[in-house]
Structures are given as structure tokens and as C-alpha cells.
Amino acid sequence: MVNRFSRRQALQAVTAGTVALSHTGPAAAEQPAAAEQGEGACVLMAEATEGPFYLDPKLERSDITEGRPGAPLNLALTIIESGPCTPIASARVDVWHCDADGLYSGYAGQGAKDTSTKGQTFLRGTQTTGSDGRVTFETIYPGWYPGRTPHIHVKILLDQKTLVTAQMYFPELLSRRIYGERDPYTTRGDAPDTTNSNDGIFKASGGESGGVMLAIAGVGDVLTGSLVIAIDRSRTSAQGGWMQWLRGKIGPN
């Protein structure tokens, strides 16, 4: 018998493992309305540029922190088929994001100090969905860098085919509170210059109605970000990376 997610069950999948948490600390006041997450649970996730910092180190692991400092964040993602709302098993889920200083692992020439992280693999990892379509990651709340609102990249593959490349986002007020109250974000000496409301990639993904907003719950110092990601297994991702996206904006070099 095929297991199908109703809208109610899809919503429950979003909040699985978080509903029992007492909402204290910075996440409490910023949790998105559950009904909003549930209504869009079976709607295709909007794609977004892969960005310039994707790597495929084939790191099959749930804890991707590698000791990087920051506010603890657990990711709970559920991958489902958009039409019937059925969980997708054996899908590979890649996630990657910057650290509290806005740096990605594995690349040179980053930031105002031209920092190199080549040879490092922090804040990257891969998990494979089980029969329930779920994966979890232990990470930290991402920092910021010029021109972008805080986000986490995600890529989903099935049978060696990339089905979707996207980015996941946070409630704006929560980011402000984390960055204003928690180390090491408070010691950076600069401030974010971009929010959800003026981030072009966020808006191009449909904004808060694009199925890209993480539902946040928390207890104490630990946050949990949950999202049901609906995909169409018959499609192939149209996002081939940062340069492909850039050429689409400015034309051939």
C-alpha cells in the first residue's frame, strides 16, 4: 500500500520532532504560522541558483558542523512527490551553507580579507531519505555576506539525476535577534546589508509563498528548522550553477 501525505500529515511531518519543544529563547516569538506551512506542503519547491560554492565531497553524515562556532541548528527535511504527496525514499539530499563569518568551505578569495578555506569541508553534508522521506542534519545558524539574506542551499538527487536545486530561508526577525544577541555573530564588526524583503534570489523563488521558508521551533539554545520539500521526480533541475544563472541575467560573455 502506498503511503500518502494529506495536507494535515504533511504539516505534521514539518513539525515532527519539534511540537513537543517548549518554545523558549529566540525562536519562540519567530515561529512561522503552522497553517501557512501546511497549505503549501504539496506545492513544488521553487528552484534557485546553485551559487558559486557548491562542492560534492560525498560526505555522508548528519553532523556537518566540524566544530564551527554558532547557534546550534537542527534541520529536519521531508522530501515528497508534489502530486500525490507521497514520501520519496532513497533520494540524496545535499545541504551546504556559510559559517557565522559568511565563509563557505572549500574555496579561496572570500570576503573582505580574501580568505581561503580550500581543503576544508565544514557545513556540507549528504543524507539519503528513508521510507518516510526524511533526513536530518546538525549544523549552525548561517551567518551573512554582502548581497544575500541568510540561507541554506539544498540539492536533491534521485537515480543520479538532480531533481531540484534550491535555497531555504529564515524568518527575518529571528535572524536579527540571533545576530544581535549571540556570539560569534555579535563580534563580527559588520551588519547584514540584505534582508528577505530586498534579496532578489529570495523574491525570485516566490518569497514566503515559494515553499522555501523553514518552520522554526526551539528550546533553550537549540533551534530546529523543518521543511517539507515537494518535488516532481519526472523533472530535472534547471539550475546548472552560478555562472549559468549569471549568463541568463547578463547574456553570453
Predicted regions: what they are:
Residues 27-29, 35:
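Boundary at the C-terminal end of the N-terminal hydrophobic targeting segment
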Residues 35-207, 230-252:
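Beta-strand-dominated extracellular/periplasmic modules and repeats
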Residues 154, 212-213:
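Glycine-rich, charged/polar anion/phosphate-binding loops
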Residues 63-66, 213-217, 222-233:
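Extracellular beta-sheet/turn segments enriched in Thr/Pro/Gly and aliphatic residues
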Residues 13-16, 27, 155:
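Alpha-helical and His/Cys-centered functional microenvironments
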Residues 1-18:
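N-terminal secretory signal peptides and thylakoid transit peptides that target proteins
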